[in-house]
C-alpha cells in the first residue's frame, strides 16, 4: 500500500509512509507536494494535515488535481484544515478571544528563510465544493479517532480550543474531510 504524508513537517508516521515536505527534516523522502514524482493511479492514500490553506484558490485546484492524478481509482484523500465555522462559532459565542483563533486562521510558519501564511480558509461547504468540482467523490467528514495513524501521531487534525488542547472537553477546530478518486 502506497501512503503519502504531504506537508508532514517534523511528523514522522513511520516506514510504511512516504513523507513529503519542503522543510529540512531527516525522515523526508521528497520535497515537492505540488509535483509528485509518482505514476498516475499509483497511490492508495494521501494525507495532508493543515497544508492546503497555504495555497490560494487557484493554486490549490492545481495541487488537488495533481494529488488526484496519482491516486488509484478508489484511492483516499484525507485533508485537515483549520475549521473557519467552528472557530467563528466559538468566537461569536464568547468562548474564545480573537487572539485564540488568529494563529489557526492565518497560520505563520518559517519556510525557506521567510515566513509563510495561510492564503485561504475553509468551512465544510467550501471544501466539499472544491473537492467535488475536481471530481473527487464520497466526500465526508472523518473522525481522527477512527484511524490508528492519527491516534498514534498527534497532529493538527486533533486541534482543539476551549480549552486549548483538551480532546475530551474542547471544541475541534480542525475540519477533517476525506474523499475518494
What kind of feature is each model-predicted range?
Residues 7, 23, 82:
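Anionic group-transfer/hydrolysis microenvironments
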